[in-house]
Amino acid sequence: MVSLTTYCLKNIVNQHAHVENTVLLYHLGLRWNCKTLYQCIQCNGVNYINSHSDQCKNKDLFLMKVIVKKNLAVARTLLSWGASPEYARLFCRNAEEEQALNLQHVADIPSSKILERLTMSYKENDEQLLITFYLLNLSTKFSTNLHEQVRFNIVSYIICDLAIHQTFKTFYAKNYSLSTLYCIFLAIYYKLYMALRKMVKIYPGLKPFAYLIGFMFDDETVTQTYSSTDDEILECKNKIIVIKGCYGNIHCRSDIDHMYAFSQNNFW
């Protein structure tokens, strides 16, 4: 059942979403980055244009981001729209924030659910992938153990071919976050070029990695944009060529049995 608060917010945003009322909308948690927020009727996500599009944002991911950015007004709105309080509590920095959002009695969320939400569920448009990238790399809430689980989650989901394993291993040795490598991989796999450009701008040292992943998937847009002549990259590229010759095209599977089998082994 939709709450009275949700109905009120919807009525306010529909009647007052113009320039002279932005102060009111900010106080009510209906503005973010100088844009008015709307709840999408079709996908139940959040957008800026009051109609469904491929840029609708997942409410749980968006909730995590606004809490990291300390915007509790928007967080309250997203919670009233049905975003998960468990994920909100995960990103609260102290008891005061939990109390302000009425989360003090919310149970802790299992690490496995956090990983599923952050690294596997939302990877099919630029906006959601960039939010995931932001959360994985800038949040201070993740423990060492959680990052270790992220590592195994990535292994179980992506490293379904020795060529991918070799590429990840090469860059993991250079102290790049596996969660960062994972997001860049997804950007190329799903051809999210805008997200890829933003990620590589933050970590320019990963241009060769983007090139190798693009090479594995025969993506000329990526290989031409991030071409590299580095000797180490050439060596890794040659290994990919050999493996492709032996095993054919690379396939990434995500079924449960396959993921579980990989998660039982340490490939690093």
Curated annotation (Swiss-Prot):
It is a single-pass membrane protein. Induction: Expressed in the early phase of the viral replicative cycle. GO terms for cellular component: host cell membrane; membrane. The keyword Membrane applies. Residues 194-268 are extracellular. The chain crosses the membrane at residues 176-193. The keyword Membrane applies. Residues 1-175 are cytoplasmic. Keywords: Early protein, Host membrane, Membrane, Transmembrane, Transmembrane helix. It comes from the Viruses. It is found in: Host membrane. Plays a role in virus cell tropism, and may be required for efficient virus replication in macrophages. Belongs to the asfivirus MGF 300 family. This is Protein MGF 300-1L. It comes from African swine fever virus (isolate Tick/Malawi/Lil 20-1/1983).
